[in-house]
């Protein structure tokens, strides 16, 4: 229960107690002068035409105030039996023949009984108390304080109302019914204002509670996340195995370390460039430099055929440099791999077959052999010179064969054609079994 309501109830109860205490004091002061409204039966019978009857068939009750005195019957139209006349404990007033009023406020109104004297007497409509007074025993008059109720009983006119003051004053007791407490007027306004305040307070409390709980949940989540997160391992071998570690860290340990490492993607700036240098271009540059140096050492520049051979060899070496891996010179076993030339006994048959087939068979390199290298210019010149000398020596003396001498131009053309065919189709595969450290043979005297 709200404390405001409790305080308000206590305050109203205090006011109620003070109000009824004042009424009790007023009744004690006025007990010395009670007013009793009586009339004689003779006067009532004399004015029998003015007497009123109960139209609803309800009996009227009489109250005997003193011996030999009674009150005239009253007419009541409310449908309730009228009690006998009794003295009011608060402020009784009566209309007499002189025009003095008598007023008493009750809660329920009762209709007026019309008589000729216009004198009002007020009774209670709910209960039927009887006030009886005697000289020996004072009666207890039950007084119910109500508001907004009026009734009037008229007594015959032109008769003086006698007021008797008995020697023994009756004691009046006031009974406060539980329904007599006035209603609280402030309840209507207070009930309208308190629900709004309660709503605002509840909304504020809910918001504060939600904020506090959300903060606690967030703190707990952050703490758990930091505790459950795995610590970062400080790997000393993040860059791989050290080149200076001579077997100190075995490969098994390295494998375990690499498995535990988190795979990270690493990209270099070179991958973003549009052109990347390849090994083939580098090897081609090396071969061009070596060929240029070897060409400077050659003194035999008078022969145009040799220059033509150099140009052809340079073109073939540059074309084949893309598939090569190492630019080194050919081994010294090039001469041993060449088959000997066939004996040229029939010159006429040789002349007829020169244009169709070459005179010597050449071994072609394997396509899958990655170690096949082009021969250098020095080796080609040396081989060409050797074959030339062998071809010259293979011819028998002209005198022994008894053949006519061939013309000089024919001999030169034959030699030139043989050299061109041999040099163009000459490619020697290196011997993998031969030792590369074997010394090369000295160059021929013609090249020097």
Swiss-Prot record:
Extracellular side: 22-202
Identification of the protein by name: Protein EVI2B
Designated gene of the protein: EVI2B
Membrane topology qualifier: Single-pass type I membrane protein
Induction of synthesis: Up-regulated by full-length CEBPA.
PANTHER family xrefs: PROTEIN EVI2B (PTHR15384:SF0)
Cited InterPro entries: EVI2B (IPR033239)
List of glycosylated residues: 16, 50, 114
Phosphoserine: residues carrying this PTM: 268, 271, 278, 294
Record topology, Cytoplasmic segments: 227-448
Signal peptide from the UniProt entry: 1-21
Phosphothreonine: modified positions: 249
Compartment annotation: Membrane
Organism, scientific name: Homo sapiens
GO biological process assignments: myeloid cell development; negative regulation of apoptotic process; positive regulation of granulocyte differentiation; positive regulation of neutrophil differentiation; regulation of cell cycle; regulation of stem cell division
Tissue specificity as recorded in UniProt: Bone marrow, peripheral blood mononuclear cells, fibroblasts and Epstein-Barr virus-transformed lymphoblastoid cell lines. Strongly expressed in granulocytic cells, and weakly on lymphocytes cells.
Region spans: Disordered: 74-108, 298-372, 427-448
Keyword Transmembrane: yes
Cited function: Required for granulocyte differentiation and functionality of hematopoietic progenitor cells through the control of cell cycle progression and survival of hematopoietic progenitor cells.
Residue intervals passing through the bilayer: 203-226
Domain of life: Eukaryota
Start-end of Polar residues biased regions: 97-108, 313-333, 350-372
Record-level GO cellular component terms: plasma membrane
Key words, A-Z: Glycoprotein, Membrane, Phosphoprotein, Proto-oncogene, Signal, Transmembrane, Transmembrane helix
Presence of the UniProt keyword Transmembrane in the record: yes
């Amino acid at each position: 229960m709200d404390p405001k309501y409790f305080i308000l109830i206590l305050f109203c109860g205090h006011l109620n107690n003070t109000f009824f205490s004042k009424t009790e004091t007023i009744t004690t002061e006025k007990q010395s002068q009670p007013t009793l409204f009586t009339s004689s039966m003779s006067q009532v019978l004399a004015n029998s035409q003015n007497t009123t009857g109960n139209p609803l068939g309800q009996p009227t009750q009489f109250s005997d105030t003193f011996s030999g005195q009674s009150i005239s019957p009253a007419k009541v139209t409310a449908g309730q039996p009228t009690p006998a006349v009794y003295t009011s404990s608060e402020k009784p007033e009566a209309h007499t023949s002189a025009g003095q009023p008598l007023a008493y406020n009750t809660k329920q109104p009762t209709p007026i009984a019309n008589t000729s004297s216009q004198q009002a007497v007020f009774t209670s409509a709910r209960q039927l108390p009887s006030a009886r007074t005697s000289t020996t025993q004072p009666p207890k008059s039950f007084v119910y304080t109500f508001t907004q109720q009026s009734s009037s009983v008229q007594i015959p006119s032109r008769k003086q109302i006698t007021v008797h003051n008995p020697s023994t004053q009756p004691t009046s007791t006031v009974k406060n019914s539980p329904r007599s407490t006035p209603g609280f007027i402030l309840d209507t306004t207070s009930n309208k204002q308190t629900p709004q305040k309660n709503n605002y307070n509840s909304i504020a409390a809910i918001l504060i509670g939600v904020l506090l709980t959300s903060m606690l949940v967030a703190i707990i989540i952050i703490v758990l996340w930091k505790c459950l997160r795995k610590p970062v391992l400080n790997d000393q071998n993040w860059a791989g195995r050290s080149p200076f570690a001579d077997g100190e860290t075995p490969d098994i340990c390295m494998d375990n370390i690499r498995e535990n490492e988190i795979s990270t993607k690493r990209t270099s700036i070179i991958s973003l460039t549009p052109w990347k240098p390849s090994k083939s271009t580098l090897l081609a540059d090396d071969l061009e430099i070596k060929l240029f140096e070897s060409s400077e050492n050659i003194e035999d520049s008078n022969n145009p055929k040799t220059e033509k051979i150099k140009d052809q060899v340079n073109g073939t070496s540059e074309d084949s440099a893309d598939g090569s891996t190492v630019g080194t010179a050919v081994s010294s076993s090039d001469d041993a791999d060449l088959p000997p030339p066939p004996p040229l006994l029939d010159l006429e048959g040789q002349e007829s077959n020169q244009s169709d087939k070459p005179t010597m068979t050449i071994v072609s390199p394997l396509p899958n052999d990655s170690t096949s290298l082009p021969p250098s210019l020095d080796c080609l010149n040396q081989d060409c010179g050797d074959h030339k000398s062998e071809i010259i020596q293979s011819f028998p003396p002209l005198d022994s064969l008894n053949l006519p001498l061939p013309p000089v131009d024919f001999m030169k053309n034959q030699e030139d054609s043989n050299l061109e065919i041999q040099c163009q189709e000459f490619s020697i595969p290196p011997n993998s079994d031969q030792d590369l450290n074997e010394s090369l043979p000295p160059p021929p005297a013609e090249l020097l």
